[in-house]
């Protein structure tokens, strides 16, 4: 395939387009942008769809432009939200922008020979507006009827929460972003999630009104699981892309646990794997001799390498193999100390751990929520100390449980593990 739109359609990226002319447009190099709001100091797994969309365009020779919303982030996008977001101050937003930029730099190529990626902050062009000048120069270009007709606006206006004037103006800011990029950078296409359709068309309509020229929008489906829930969240919260917020091991583990019903779709949308290989895994999963989690392992390897790099993937695999319950891998304190930076760990006083019941330790480390749950897991053979199965409900922590007198690797089932650092007075 020589056209990026064909690839995106085959992989399930396209939810809607403002015009089918986009395919013809992409036969020549263009500039395409997507915006990222700085609501946190890291993007999460759900945002990876947008980054991959930009990355696919770049692979076909188009220039990806990432907008980090230093201005729009202060307003808060109402799209898909039931209530108004808490507004962030400028200092917090600047901190978040740095983290998000690192996420983008890990995946997009900023040294591409013909189409290097660009990161821009929309505060750079909004900060020079006064309220009066913005109303005069930008506000007059928008009409209330189409603004009120946007689904994101109608939903909020009909809710008990209502909608503030601040949020109502968000689509004006995003629409002006597109106009500014069109005029100053030659950007002609905007990417966004399906919940961004109204904001994207605000921009395409504005460009047509001001310049009588076409601009285009593409929306992709929001990343969801087969049960309809948003993908990118775990029991502990968002699956962050930044290693400072989530280790490569925990990131890898989240992907290994993906349900069979979701893995092929995630391969299509979150990896650069060839479609032939993806179809091979899809067929393999239907075979009677399929080894469970084979496809998930391939998925986890690809996405972890993409987000955390080759070294991050090596660490994730090493930790996974080293702390697997029942693993024959020899554990020593030095190895565990290194692993502790990439998996859940805690510190406890040695005197408070020795001679403690294992059931109590499971609860104190929050690997189990109650003693009754801990007992049940022990009876079912799901508790391990230093990779060795423990089935005695009355097991007491002794010096024999310690690695080099200072560490314990405790596991509750295959998913939940904890390295306990033992501190002497």
Curated annotation (Swiss-Prot):
SMART domains: S4. It is found in: Cytoplasm. It comes from the Bacteria. It catalyses: tRNA(Tyr) + L-tyrosine + ATP = L-tyrosyl-tRNA(Tyr) + AMP + diphosphate + H(+). ATP binds at residue 233. PROSITE patterns: AA_TRNA_LIGASE_I, S4. A motif ('KMSKS' region) lies at residues 230-234. A motif ('HIGH' region) lies at residues 38-47. Residues 356-422 form the S4 RNA-binding domain. Its EC number is 6.1.1.1. Pfam families: SYY_C-terminal, tRNA-synt_1b. GO terms for cellular component: cytosol. InterPro entries: aa-tRNA-synth_I_CS, aa-tRNA-synth_Ic, Rossmann-like_a/b/a_fold, S4_RNA-bd, S4_RNA-bd_sf, SYY-like_C, Tyr-tRNA-ligase, Tyr-tRNA-ligase_bac-type. One of its GO terms (biological process) is tyrosyl-tRNA aminoacylation. One of its GO terms (molecular function) is RNA binding. Catalyzes the attachment of tyrosine to tRNA(Tyr) in a two-step reaction: tyrosine is first activated by ATP to form Tyr-AMP and then transferred to the acceptor end of tRNA(Tyr). Belongs to the class-I aminoacyl-tRNA synthetase family. TyrS type 1 subfamily. This is Tyrosine--tRNA ligase. The gene is tyrS.
């Amino acid at each position: 395939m020589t056209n990026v739109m064909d690839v995106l359609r085959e992989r399930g990226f396209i939810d809607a387009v403002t015009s089918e002319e986009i395919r013809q447009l992409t036969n020549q190099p263009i500039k395409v942008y997507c915006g990222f709001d700085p609501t946190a100091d890291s993007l999460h797994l759900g945002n990876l769809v947008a980054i991959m969309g930009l990355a696919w365009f770049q692979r076909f020779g188009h220039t990806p432009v990432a907008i980090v919303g230093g201005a729009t982030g202060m307003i808060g996008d109402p799209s898909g939200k039931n209530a108004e977001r808490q507004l962030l101050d400028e200092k917090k937003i600047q901190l978040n922008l740095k983290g998000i930029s690192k996420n983008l730099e890990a995946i997009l190529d900023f040294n591409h020979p013909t189409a290097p990626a660009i990161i821009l902050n929309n505060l750079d062009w909004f900060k020079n507006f006064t309220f009066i000048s913005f109303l005069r120069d930008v506000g007059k270009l928008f009409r209330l009827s189409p603004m009120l007709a946007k689904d994101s606006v109608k939903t909020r206006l009909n809710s008990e929460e209502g909608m503030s004037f601040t949020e109502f103006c968000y689509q004006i800011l995003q629409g002006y972003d597109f106009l500014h990029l069109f005029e100053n950078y030659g950007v002609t296409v905007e990417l966004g999630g399906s919940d961004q359709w109204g904001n994207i068309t605000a921009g395409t309509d504005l460009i047509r009104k001001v310049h009588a020229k076409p601009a285009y929008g593409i929306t992709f489906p929001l990343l969801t699981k087969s049960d309809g829930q948003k993908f990118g969240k775990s029991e502990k919260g968002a699956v962050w892309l930044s290693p400072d917020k989530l280790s490569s091991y925990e990131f890898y583990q989240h992907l290994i646990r993906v349900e069979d019903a979701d893995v092929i779709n995630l391969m299509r949308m979150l990896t650069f794997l060839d479609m032939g290989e993806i179809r091979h895994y899809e067929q393999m999963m239907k075979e009677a001799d399929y080894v469970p989690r084979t496809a998930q392992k391939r998925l986890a390897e690809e996405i972890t390498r993409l987000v955390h790099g080759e070294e991050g993937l090596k660490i994730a695999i090493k930790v996974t193999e080293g702390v697997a319950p029942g693993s024959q891998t020899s554990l020593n304190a030095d190895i565990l100390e290194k692993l502790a930076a990439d998996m859940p760990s805690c510190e406890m006083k040695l005197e408070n751990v020795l001679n403690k019941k294992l059931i109590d330790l499971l609860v104190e480390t929050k690997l189990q929520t109650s003693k009754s749950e801990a007992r049940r897991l022990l009876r079912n053979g799901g508790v391990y100390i230093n990779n060795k199965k423990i089935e005695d409900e009355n097991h007491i922590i002794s010096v024999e449980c310690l690695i080099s007198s200072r560490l314990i690797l405790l596991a509750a089932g295959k998913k939940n593990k904890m390295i306990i650092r033992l501190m002497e007075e």
